[in-house]
Each structure stands twice: as structure tokens, then as C-alpha cells.
């Protein structure tokens, strides 16, 4: 279970006493998630999620994340809404960790999304980008192209233990992407981690977007490229162009891509794949003793990179004029 900080009953009761969310009926740890400690709270008023932020989330970034969720929820986006305590603040402390209570969202994530899920996700992503346009805070993307070489430096010496010639392939990718990375594309608030486990569905409709703790200010099309990587590859490693076409078309129905974004899509998709390969690779090589959470396989994204290197245009992802 992904519960890194144990919370005694007495400490939890004292923390909840500062909130107008009713009396606690039950609570349990949530196994999903690898970054933070999460609990499901059931009270006499309703259901909530309690999150304790572990070391990987910088406390100084929390006002951005929490402010963004409040902003998006106020504009009708289905996302967790931070609950403020009686003092009027959303951010508290519990067991030495920054802690927040947010609203509970109904729905389930899908492990193997179909075309209809990809279409709904494209529509929801465009809605997120539109809702965040007037959000006043900014947060640079700490895991964009400038961060990839320092990340690789942490793993380069051991990379070929994970897969033959992985280090050489990664050096080539870095050189190409650093040279050609697109700048000044249309941008604003992006989610930057909208994998299938961060999207809830009821039927074929998106019922909620969660886990905004990589959200930042960057190119909108990069967020779309992350989603193409996360949603449109099959288990055999092939890219499903039908899913890509559904996602891109639904996104474009709300926010048409401009010609620069279309031209840049292959590089953005390759860069997105490299970003997740590198963070997974570093985690894979640095599993702490006794870890309860298995790190994600970096080679899944090494295989996706092999596809992106061959792509010559956005049409291969399903974009149509």
C-alpha cells in the first residue's frame, strides 16, 4: 500500500477537528499512487481524500497546485476541490507532513482505454487548458528538456544494465531534442501527468481529473503529446492511430492546433516519452530497501521512443487537416 506516513487515530482526530466536514465514520489507506500518502475519509457529511505530501513534492509548490485546483473547480472542471479549515486555509500539517483534504470524485479509472475513452480524454484536456487560461500563478516545468540531461547523468553509468545500448540511444535522443525542441508554442497551465490512473470515468464520460502535482506552465501541445503516449499505445507496443485520431479530433473541436503545434507534435511526443523513460529509469535504479511500491518499467517508454524516432509527421499520430 502506498502509505508512507502512518497516522495515529488521535492525530487524525485532532487534525479533522479544524474542519467542518462532519464526524469521521471510517478511513482507510489508498493503495494507488506512488508520490504521496492518501487516505479515504468517510464522514457524516460525505466522502473526502486526505493527502500527506511526501518528500518528492516541494512544499513551496503547494500553493500553486491547490490554487489551481480551486480555480479549475470554480470554472466547472471536475477535479478535486481543496477543503479549507475553519481558519480559512487549505494547507495544514499532520504528522510532520504538509496535508490537505480535498473533495471526493466518483468514477473509476480504465486500465485499457478504448477509442471512446480517448475521445473523451481529448475533450477533457482541451477543457482543462481553457479553464486554466486566466489562472494568475505560474510554475515552470521542472521536468522539461533542460532537466533531462541532469536526470540521465544519474543513470547513465548503469543504463545498459537495464537494456543493451540504452545509454547510447538516450544520448542520441537528448542531442536531437535539445537541438530542435520547439519554443514559444501556445501554452499555459498543463496537467503534465494525465495517465489513465489520473482520469475517472462513469461509462464513457470523464467524471474527474486528479493528481495535479506535476501541473505547470508549458506548451498545451506537450500535454497532448503526453496523453498520446499514455493512452494510445497497445500492449504489444504498437501505436493505435484510431485512438490518436479520436483524441486529437476531440481536442481540436474545442481548441484547434495551430500549424506550429502540428509540425512540432512528433518532437513533443518523443520528448514526452524520453521524460517518462528517464524518471522511471532513475527510480528503477534507486529502489530503496524494503520499498512497498514497485517502480514502473522504463523500457515501456524505451519501446515508445523507438516508434517516435521513425515518425515523420503528425498524421502518424492521427492528426487530420
Curated annotation (Swiss-Prot):
One of its GO terms (biological process) is threonine biosynthetic process. Disulfide bonds: none annotated. Pathway: Amino-acid biosynthesis; L-threonine biosynthesis; L-threonine from L-aspartate: step 4/5. Its EC number is 2.7.1.39. Coiled coil: none annotated. It catalyses: L-homoserine + ATP = O-phospho-L-homoserine + ADP + H(+). The keyword Nucleotide-binding applies. One of its GO terms (molecular function) is ATP binding. HAMAP family: Homoser_kinase_2. Belongs to the pseudomonas-type ThrB family. NCBIfam families: PRK05231.1 (NF003558), thrB_alt (TIGR00938). This is Homoserine kinase. It comes from Methylobacterium sp. (strain 4-46).
Amino acid at each position: 500500500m502506498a502509505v508512507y506516513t502512518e497516522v495515529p487515530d488521535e492525530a487524525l482526530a485532532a487534525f479533522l477537528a479544524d474542519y467542518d466536514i462532519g464526524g469521521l465514520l471510517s478511513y482507510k489507506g489508498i493503495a494507488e499512487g506512488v508520490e504521496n500518502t492518501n487516505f479515504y475519509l468517510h464522514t457524516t457529511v460525505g466522502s473526502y481524500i486526505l493527502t500527506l505530501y511526501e518528500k518528492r513534492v516541494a512544499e513551496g509548490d503547494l500553493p500553486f497546485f491547490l490554487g489551481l485546483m480551486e480555480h479549475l473547480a470554480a470554472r466547472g472542471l471536475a477535479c478535486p476541490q481543496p477543503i479549507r479549515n475553519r481558519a480559512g486555509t487549505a494547507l495544514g500539517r499532520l504528522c510532520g507532513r504538509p496535508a490537505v483534504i480535498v473533495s471526493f470524485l466518483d468514477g473509476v479509472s480504465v486500465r485499457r482505454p478504448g477509442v471512446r475513452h480517448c475521445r473523451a480524454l481529448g475533450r477533457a484536456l482541451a477543457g482543462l487548458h481553457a479553464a486554466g487560461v486566466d489562472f494568475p500563478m505560474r510554475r515552470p516545468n521542472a521536468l522539461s528538456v533542460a532537466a533531462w540531461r541532469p536526470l540521465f547523468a544519474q543513470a547513465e553509468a548503469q543504463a545498459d544494465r537495464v537494456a543493451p545500448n540504452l545509454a547510447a540511444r538516450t544520448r542520441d535522443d537528448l542531442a536531437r531534442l535539445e537541438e530542435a525542441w520547439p519554443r514559444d508554442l501556445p501554452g499555459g497551465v498543463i496537467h503534465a501527468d494525465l495517465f489513465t490512473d489520473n482520469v475517472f470515468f462513469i461509462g464513457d464520460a470523464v467524471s474527474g481529473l486528479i493528481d495535479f502535482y506535476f501541473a505547470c506552465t508549458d506548451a498545451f501541445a506537450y500535454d497532448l503529446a503526453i496523453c498520446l503516449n499514455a493512452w494510445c499505445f497497445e500492449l504489444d507496443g504498437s501505436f493505435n492511430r484510431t485512438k490518436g485520431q479520436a483524441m486529437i479530433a476531440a481536442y481540436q473541436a474545442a481548441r484547434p492546433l495551430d500549424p506550429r503545434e502540428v509540425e512540432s507534435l512528433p518532437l513533443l511526443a518523443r520528448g514526452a516519452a524520453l521524460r517518462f523513460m528517464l524518471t522511471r529509469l532513475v527510480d528503477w535504479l534507486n529502489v530503496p530497501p524494503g520499498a512497498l511500491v514497485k517502480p514502473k518499467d522504463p523500457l515501456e517508454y524505451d519501446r515508445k521512443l523507438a516508434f517516435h524516432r521513425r515518425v515523420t509527421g503528425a498524421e502518424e499520430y492521427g492528426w487530420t487537416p
